[in-house]
Amino acid sequence: MKRSTEEAVRRRRSFFLLASTSGCAALALAWSCSQPTPRSEPPTPPPAPEPSSLSAESLDVLDDEAEISVELEATLDEWFGDLFEPRYVVLPEWREAGFDPNTSPFEGARAFEGIDEADLETIRAGNREHWSSVLNAIDRNANRLPGPWPGRRDLNQTWRDVRLNRNAVGPADFKREARRLFEEDFPTSADTARLYARNCQQCHGMTGAGDGPMSNMMEPRPRDYRHGVFKFSSVSSPARPRRDDLRRTLEHGLPGTQMASWRERLGMGEREALIDRVRWIAIRGEVERWLVASWIADEEPPSEAIEDAYRTIWSRWLTADDYFVALQDDVPPADAASIERGNALFHDATRGNCASCHGDGGRGDGPNAVEVTPDGVRHPLLRDEWGRPAWPRDLRNGVFRGGSRPIDIYRRVHCGVHGTPMPAQGDTLTQDEIWDLVHYVRSIAGLEPE
């Protein structure tokens, strides 16, 4: 199942060059490499070592285990492909159920994960909007048709083939095939890798570690997808986010951060494919961490532990709907009585206990989370899963990264904020009590009742 080492090395280096080198720098590099080396110069040094696809944490833990590191990387490549052409091993039970996550949903093999015909029609509608100028040119039977598009090598090749066949099939068949290509656009895994490199890696990094070249200038820093932990979702643990959760982030961004909306910049099929890409990074990262832990605990080789890890991690994504926190009834009115009850819960150390971190009145300066020195300097006392300072939200400013709708804040209280000290209260507070907290929080944020 693996490519030759030589081919993998060649493709990995070329892809990192694509992602990290500007066009002018690449031309300068190509020109300088084409010039003869003066005889007086020393010999060219050997090429830099091939960058590992393993995380820095794994390499650090396995620093004295070179053979295991090699086996781990080879095992992950066998089950996940690589950064440039990701793929999954299809388990027997998936094949029996007609599920293949490597395919476009329009090929009919993704219903197992909950992508139904209604979802497909939604993608078609979004694609029609995004590709409207192309579809209009097709409908007009224009002589000059749009294309190519950056980062869409596979789409460009298919589009060339369709155009070359234009006269052979006739106008009606050409129009039907051409429209279908764009209405059902869903990038291949390789095209999605290129889309990610063009649009995401500057912040999130090529491996999804949140270490892109822009990341050090950002607060908060970009998400490290490889932990499989996503702060803002509509599910309780141990599930991973639903597609709707990741879709909402791509479409609306995260207020108060540098994560912008991609709704106007990418087509719906492209956004859906990037959801697949983020999921691939997360599942591969979680499996890698599992395999390293298995080796450290029991010296179980990666090649023997992989199937159990793979199946377990995947199940957390496929069963997300089972942990979905749905809105059971209409949102109760945000009247004065509800807000007052929410205020009491917020400050009650035995019930809501929100003020212990968010502070009196929601100022984000609670004694359990922030230490304030006599000269007024604030120091965080809490850390998130990634080891970074966890500052409680100042609720008065009305900026809620996971959304400011009543249901968004309800889910933050019910499910917590995954990967942070913000706990889930769904098992300790009643539904009515959570709504009282929601109404109180929205009132101090100055948000109008909905």
Spans of features found by a protein language model:
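N-terminal secretory signal peptides that target proteins for export/translocation
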Residues: 1-15
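C-terminal motif of bacterial Sec signal peptides marking the signal peptidase cleavage site
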Residues: 29-32
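Bacterial signal peptide processing site
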Residues: 34-36
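Short sequence/structural segments immediately N-terminal
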Residues: 40-41, 52, 56-69, 73, ...
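Extracytoplasmic electron-transfer domains, predominantly the class I c-type cytochrome c fold
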Residues: 46-70, 74, 78-79, 83-84, ...
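Electrostatic cytochrome c docking/interface patches
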Residues: 60-195, 303-349
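Sequence/structural segment immediately N-terminal to covalent heme-attachment motifs in c-type
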Residues: 185-206, 319, 334-363, 367-379, ...
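Extracellular/periplasmic ectodomains of large secreted or surface enzymes and adhesion receptors
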Residues: 304-341, 362-396, 409, 448-450
